[in-house]
Amino acid sequence: MPMKMGWRWYGEGNDPVSLSDIKQIPGVTSIVWALHDKMPGEIWEVDEIQKVADQIHAYGFDMDVVESVNVHDDIKIGLPTRDKYIENYKQCIRNLSKFGVKVICYNFMPVFDWTRTDLFHPVGDGSTALFYEKDKIKDDYKAMAEYIMSFTEKYNMTFPGWEPARMAKLDELFKPYAPVTKEKLWENLKYFLEALMPTCHECGIKMAIHQDDPPWDIFGLPRLLVDAQSIDRFLSMVDDPYNCLTLCTGSLNANPNNNCAEIVRKHCDRIAFGHIRNIHHFPNGDFSEAAHRDCCGETGIIEVLRAYHDCGFEGYIRPDHGRQLWEEGPGNCRPGYGKYDRALGVQYMLGVWDLLDRLDEEKKKG
């Protein structure tokens, strides 16, 4: 079975890009979805899943990949209450398996999910993109949260990992993490996964961890999945075929020393889901997200796709963050999740894949 192309969709009334729009993009067969109104630790009930399933299936898409079932902070911190939330997570897995879900993407980042300093940064050609300015990331996490929340308040748009209910109690979230060292966070991640693996086997669902974004410590909080060595540790720590990766080229390549193609070749059999995102680096350590075409950034998109192709990858891939093009901007577009640049990215990736298929066919013919 060949690689399957997905598209992240935030749901009816929550995403300016409709399923009807997505249906018109050649090659997209899978909707990457979630119940975005659920808080970490809550059970995803069958009737809630059914409602979204009906919407997705009406357009002929599969719903094999969920992004994300977020992990409760008590699990990450290692509090005594974590077992209750792990049991809830297991029930989510069981309920999702009733709808044919094959992969759950998640992350284990403390407090914050992704972090950027500008959501609509001009990139010089009239488009805008997500931008990270290193000098703006100091120790003032409240200022960063206020910036993100300003978009929520002005445009009624929420962002995964930056939910208003969580941001309203930032100090409460930070305090329990004070004694959590990097090693303790590793221990808590292992505990979580070892508890889940029997349920994953029972239900046929792979847990696929997303790398930390950006891949370095911020606001004094430890980050785990940041480079090839930490990925090696993660996969060997719970050496189980259902303990997998969501390999995000954009998160990893925010550090230009990370070679994503090499990681794909080494761990292709443990990659369940791939995010393809291009990054343009600046000499001072800042970075901007870029178009998917190889020459628009320094991620090495062609080599990453070649690595997946050479490995016979049969999992799921989606275009990750693109630019905001033409009329897209605050109020009518989710940062990084516009319609046009991601659609262009899909066609670019499938074009590279088709060429690699053709070259293989010609080799076989001699």
Sequence positions of predicted segments:
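Histidine-acidic metal/acid-base catalytic patches
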Residues: M1-G6, G11-G13, D54-H57, D74-G78, ...
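Catalytic domains of carbohydrate-active enzymes, especially glycoside hydrolases
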Residues: G11-H36, Q55-Y59, N95-I104
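An N-terminal, globular interaction/scaffold subdomain
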Residues: E45-S68, Y85
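Conserved beta-strand edge residues that scaffold enzyme active sites
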Residues: H36-D37, N70, P110-V111, P214, ...
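Extended, charge-rich helix/loop segments that form flexible
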Residues: V111-N188
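Glycine-rich, proline-tolerant flexible connector loops at the mouths of alpha/beta enzymes
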Residues: A34-Q50, F219
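Acidic/aromatic-lined carbohydrate-recognition and catalytic surfaces
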Residues: V65-F99, V103-V123, S127, K134-A145
